[in-house]
Design a protein with these regions (language model features):
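Acidic-and-aromatic substrate-binding clefts and catalytic sites of carbohydrate-active enzymes
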Residues: 38-43, 104-108
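Active-site beta-strand-loop-beta-strand hairpin of nuclease catalytic cores
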Residues: 48-60
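Acidic carboxylate-rich catalytic motifs and surrounding loops in phosphoryl-/glycosyl-chemistry enzymes
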Residues: 35-37, 98-104, 130-132
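Residue-level detector of flexible, active-site-proximal loop/helix-junction positions
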Residues: 38-39, 65, 132-136
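Acidic-basic catalytic patches of nuclease active cores, encompassing PD-(D/E)XK
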Residues: 1-38
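Non-catalytic C-terminal interaction segments of nucleic acid-processing enzymes
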Residues: 110-152
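Alpha-helical scaffolding within the catalytic cores
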Residues: 43-46, 81
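Catalytic cores of nucleic-acid endonucleases
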Residues: 62-120
Length: 152
């Protein structure tokens, strides 16, 4: 049970709620949080962090600060693939957003020489940095350190 607490992502989930609220303010629209969007077969669904069918917007939130592991890169790539699948299945182009909470993450996703960064450019995914409080940053970093201890 102690390990479950150590690997908890409660702080990141809290940060995602705050970031979601800020995204609505930045975009100036009401978004649906974590909707289940069913695909063609009505059995399979995706569940982005935010969505607006009316405004053709879909997005994901990455509440991580600093270097991330390969698994987290795969998570980002998976999130992007889901957004691209939505375009294909719905036969319409959505504005795709990926929200981060640090300049470092924004810069890495937009400007690195990785295939992931190039995919973001080629598929016109907008990386938006949402400012969060220093206190929340510290909570996220503390959680990441705690998770690192249990996951290594």
């Amino acid at each position: 049970m102690a390990n479950a607490y150590k690997s908890s992502s409660e702080e990141q989930q809290y940060a995602e709620n705050i970031i979601f609220d800020e995204i609505e303010k930045v975009l100036g629209i009401t978004l649906t949080k974590n909707p289940k969007i069913y695909l063609n077969d009505k059995k399979t669904h995706i569940q982005p962090d935010f969505y607006s069918e009316t405004n053709c917007i879909v997005g994901e939130i990455f509440s991580h600060i600093g270097n991330y592991k390969v698994g987290q890169s795969h998570k980002i790539a998976s999130d992007i693939l889901k957004m691209l699948l939505l375009d294909k299945v719905k036969n319409k182009k959505h504005s795709k957003f990926f929200a981060v909470c640090s300049d470092e993450e924004k810069n890495k996703l937009e400007n690195s020489s990785s295939w992931l960064s190039e995919s973001i450019k080629q598929f016109e995914i907008k990386i938006i940095k949402i400012d969060i409080s220093d206190d929340l940053k510290e909570k996220i970093l503390s959680a990441q350190n705690r998770q690192k201890m249990i996951n290594n």
